[in-house]
Amino acid sequence: MRDTQSPGPDQRRDVPATRCASTVTPMLVLDGRHFDGVSETALLTLHQRATEAARPDGIIDDPIAIMLRDRIDYDYHHFGRTHQATAWRALGFDIASREYLDVHPRATVVALAEGLQTSFWRLDNGELSWLSVDLAPIVRLREQLLPTSTRLRTCARSALDYSWMDLVDSANGVLVTAEGLFQYLQPASVFDLIAACAKRFAGGRLVFDSVPKFLSRYSQRRGLKLSKQYTAPPMPFWFTAKQYDQLRAIDGIEAVWELPAPPGRGRVIGSAARLMYRLPQLSGLRAPTTIVEFS
């Protein structure tokens, strides 16, 4: 983990404050060009989600994402064209999370490598507790720019530093989310982390997404170029529903299933997604959102 200094006077400017459901610090705009240790993928996914949320026909309601994006002065066009895929993934995580929170409303949600996600404000039921785990630069940025809550804590550690588990109150249930994380890890690290969660959080759940084999291989061999200026990082871990037996073999895992496709925007996209999820022979081509239940 690399530490960064707080932005200097030349990196921020005061603008009028805005009101949110939670307490908000005075409105600042930070210069994203000077961030050190903040992954560009965090800015990319924020931009994609906020752009979708700002559409009149957007598939996700995320005003905090729009606010956060606007508080970071950055050339988002650097990432190329926007699309709904990132918001579609977030919508799937919201659906899976709400299913668990409907039964365990006071559960602790642990968001691993949360980046600049804003899931807490979309899911907050007034009772849950939230632990945001990420490296120090991201944690500092979140604390500077996002609303606060007495039920929202941060932990400046890697998801692979299992000491974050000591901060989790499991009395009312635990939901661990890994949104946009596992594909950037080595396979052994992913399975070790899942096994550690299963051992530690009996009765809890894990939700994660992954990419299919062809996309992983392409990203490593040729690079996934999203624009002339930006190429996505390599994704060494791939995983589809065809590999679920590997998870079922881990001690402490009760059940594994794939989240059905959430609704997308547009007739063509919606029809293609339904077809992709309806045909078993296409399971190896999907980028699934997987739910793991711990015994």
Feature map (PLM): residue ranges:
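Short alpha-helix
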Residues: 235-260
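Short amphipathic alpha-helix with an adjacent loop that forms part of the alpha/beta core around
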Residues: 162-171
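Conserved beta-strand signature within the Rossmann-like core of class I S-adenosyl-L-methionine
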Residues: 200-213
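Short, glycine-/aromatic-enriched active-site segment of Class I SAM-dependent methyltransferases
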Residues: 217-234
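Rossmann-like AdoMet
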Residues: 2, 13-110, 114-157, 170
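Conserved catalytic loop of SAM-dependent methyltransferase domains
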Residues: 251-278
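A conserved beta-strand element that flanks and buttresses the S-adenosyl-L-methionine
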Residues: 176-177
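A short, conserved alpha-helix within the catalytic core of class I
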Residues: 184-196
